[in-house]
């Protein structure tokens, strides 16, 4: 009897236990993870130092020159001849400490922008392909989806020609494909000829304003986009087309693809952001698609579909909240990869344009002076890269464990 009473009390204790959300439980597990807390502290210090330096510590890289103080070792105490240089100076007499701190802002910008590009484009594509692979869309859902898809794809020729209206033209092509499919049932096969030709002509004519080579490139891009938009949206066809494009991008080594994109666009921090963001799109697309396809097989999603809930309600109420955990973890680790990729591009001279401070560019400018004993010119930018990447990776590992529903107590 006593054993039975003990079990009953345990059930009662469980019944009256305070309800806790997934996010509260995740936060408690995160702060209990010492490794994750180390990563969180490193990330917070990195964010605070980069933000403070950018907004409250003015720095003009073009005027930060002192040829009489070239390659000085770290100096902690000022003298009559030399000022304080905590990290020493580089080949032009520039203070490495200030450049390292301000370079953190550029690395932070690259990480945030690149991950945002990858997450928004890849996440939306993965969400839509996974959700609508087995669910039929009505006319207005197809109309809105194809309009947005045409607009997104049209941003590529619009960016090449610097003419924003091209994105609007391809949005109209996407919307027109749905109308064509709905109201011209007897001529559906002709869309395979009409829309690719329309996309090629519109893109090529707009590209002629810039030059013949740009018109040729835009014509080919417009042809491919028009062919893609001519396909009926929904079902496995839409998913297969998007995923095969993602597979093609993944077939290239990420660093080589980023270098090729930057070489085509030209050097610069903004071009590096775009290149790193484009390379990361397939990762988020595949992750979001697999997560969505797993969630859509759950009983609560099938039940909501059975009772007639709208697709948008199912998508935003049942599916999207339940796929955020792996995406948040991937985005956190993606920040580390973006910072590392930006440093690699900067080291090769394809990132920030000198004299803009950036950790990879600082390494590329200073590694040749190691043989002369100027170790500080390489050590501190390298440590900054290592610590920031390590911090985001440790935090990402901790978030992955904290957000795992299998270990929720």
Where would I find each of the regions flagged by the language model?
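Gly/Trp-centered helix-boundary motif
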Residues: 1-224, 228-231, 237, 255, ...
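Transmembrane alpha-helix boundary and packing residues in multipass membrane permease domains
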Residues: 46, 127, 259, 263, ...
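Transmembrane alpha-helices
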Residues: 105-121, 267, 293, 312-344, ...
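The feature captures the transmembrane alpha-helix scaffold of multi-pass secondary transporters
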Residues: 237-244, 256, 269-273, 315, ...
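Hydrophobic transmembrane alpha-helices
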Residues: 245, 251, 258-265, 274-284, ...
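Glycine-rich helix-loop "coupling/hinge" segments at transmembrane-helix boundaries
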Residues: 250, 261-266, 276-277, 290-292, ...
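Transmembrane helix boundary and interhelical loop/hinge segments in multi-pass membrane proteins
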Residues: 290-300, 399-401, 405-406
């Amino acid at each position: 009897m006593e054993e039975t009473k003990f079990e009953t009390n345990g059930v009662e204790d469980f019944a009256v236990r305070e309800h806790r959300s997934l996010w509260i439980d995740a936060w408690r597990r995160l702060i209990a993870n010492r490794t994750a807390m180390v990563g969180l502290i490193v990330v917070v210090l990195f964010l605070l130092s980069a933000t403070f330096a950018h907004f409250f510590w003015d720095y003009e890289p073009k005027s930060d020159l002192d040829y009489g103080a070239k390659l000085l070792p770290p100096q902690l105490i000022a003298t009559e001849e030399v000022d304080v240089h905590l990290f020493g100076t580089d080949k032009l007499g520039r203070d490495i400490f200030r450049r390292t701190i301000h370079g953190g802002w550029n690395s932070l910008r690259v990480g945030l922008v690149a991950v945002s590009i990858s997450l928004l484009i890849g996440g939306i594509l993965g969400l839509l392909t996974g959700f609508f692979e087995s669910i039929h869309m009505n006319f207005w859902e197809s109309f809105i989806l194809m309009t947005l898809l045409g607009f997104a794809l049209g941003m590529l020729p619009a960016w090449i020609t610097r003419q924003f209206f091209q994105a609007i033209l391809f949005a109209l092509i996407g919307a027109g494909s749905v109308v064509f499919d709905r109201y011209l049932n007897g001529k559906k096969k002709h869309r395979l000829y009409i829309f690719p030709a329309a996309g090629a002509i519109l893109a090529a004519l707009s590209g002629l304003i810039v030059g013949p080579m740009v018109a040729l490139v835009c014509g080919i891009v417009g042809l491919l986009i028009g062919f893609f938009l001519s396909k009926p949206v929904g079902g496995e066809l839409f998913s297969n087309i998007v995923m095969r494009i993602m597979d093609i991008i993944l077939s290239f080594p990420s660093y080589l693809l980023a270098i090729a994109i930057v070489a085509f666009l030209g050097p610069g921090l903004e071009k590096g952001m775009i290149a790193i963001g484009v390379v990361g799109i397939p990762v988020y697309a595949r992750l979001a698609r697999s997560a969505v396809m797993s969630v859509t097989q759950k009983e609560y999603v099938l039940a909501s579909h059975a009772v007639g809930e709208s697709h948008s309600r199912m998508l935003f109420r049942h599916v999207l909240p339940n796929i955020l955990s792996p995406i948040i973890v991937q985005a956190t680790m993606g920040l580390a990869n973006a910072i590392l990729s930006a440093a690699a591009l900067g080291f090769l001279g394809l990132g920030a344009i000198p004299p803009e401070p950036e950790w990879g560019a600082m390494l590329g400018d200073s590694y040749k002076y190691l043989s002369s004993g100027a170790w500080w010119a390489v050590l501190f930018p390298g440590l900054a890269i290592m610590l920031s990447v390590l911090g985001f990776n440790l935090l990402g590992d901790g978030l992955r464990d904290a957000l795992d529903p299998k270990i929720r107590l």
